[in-house]
């Protein structure tokens, strides 16, 4: 019986010792569904914002959105920052042929285009932002050279790793 209790306590102690520790987000980042997110209130062109996200955190990119739940979470996150302007996300058409890709390389299957979008207005809109007029819930293709606030997304890091 004593051996059983010792073995059980050993298993509990090992599981609490940091092995398999819960992933964490950096201070100032918000977590949801296994990812970390941060809204940056800095004006950047789409490509500069993507580069910033990559440099800010290991594995970071402009945000990719894969569900209505994630879209609602992001809309609330942006709302809490009192942002009244469009915000860059990680969707673009790199070849300028209307084939949309996420900057993190993830699959493009969920969409939330605003009515009439994408429209490639003046044949010059190949990057995508959340539209403020829709409560940041719908997407619009926009000129990549426009400067906007943006949202970065990254995998959380395990405790003890350096971000």
Swiss-Prot record:
What pairs make up the disulfide bonds? 25-36, 53-152, 127-144
| Family stated for the protein in its record | Belongs to the true venom lectin family.
- The protein's role, per its UniProt record: Mannose-binding lectin which recognizes specific carbohydrate structures and agglutinates a variety of animal cells by binding to cell-surface glycoproteins and glycolipids. May be a calcium-dependent lectin.
Q: Lineage of the native species?
A: Eukaryota, Metazoa, Chordata, Craniata, Vertebrata
Q: Where's the motif Mannose-binding?
A: 117-119
Gene Ontology CC terms, in alphabetical order: extracellular region
GO MF term list: carbohydrate binding; metal ion binding
Summed up, the tissue specificity of this protein is: Expressed by the venom gland.
Residue stretches in coiled coil? none
Gene3D superfamilies attached to this UniProt entry? Mannose-Binding Protein A, subunit A (3.10.100.10)
According to the record, the signal peptide region is: 1-21
Q: Which UniProt keywords apply?
A: Calcium, Disulfide bond, Lectin, Metal-binding, Secreted, Signal
Write down what this protein is called: C-type lectin lectoxin-Lio2
Organism, as annotated: Erythrolamprus poecilogyrus
Q: Where in the cell is it found?
A: Secreted
Q: Binding positions for Ca(2+)?
A: 125, 141
Domain C-type lectin intervals: 32-153
**What Pfam families would the database entry show?**
Lectin_C (PF00059)
């Amino acid at each position: 019986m004593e051996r059983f209790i010792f073995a059980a306590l050993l298993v509990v102690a090992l599981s609490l010792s940091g092995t398999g520790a819960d992933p964490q987000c950096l201070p100032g980042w918000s977590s949801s569904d296994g990812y970390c997110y941060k809204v940056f209130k800095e004006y950047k062109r789409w490509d500069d914002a993507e580069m910033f996200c990559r440099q800010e955190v290991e594995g970071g990119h402009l945000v990719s959105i894969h569900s209505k739940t994630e879209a609602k979470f992001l809309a609330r996150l942006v709302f809490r920052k009192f942002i009244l302007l469009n915000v860059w996300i990680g969707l673009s058409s790199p070849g300028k042929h209307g084939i949309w890709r996420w900057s993190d390389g993830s699959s493009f299957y969920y969409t939330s285009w605003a009515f009439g979008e994408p429209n490639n207005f003046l044949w010059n809109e190949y990057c995508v932002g959340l539209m403020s007029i829709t409560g940041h819930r719908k997407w619009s293709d926009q000129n990549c050279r426009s400067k906007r606030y943006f949202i970065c997304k990254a995998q959380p890091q395990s405790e003890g790793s350096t971000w």
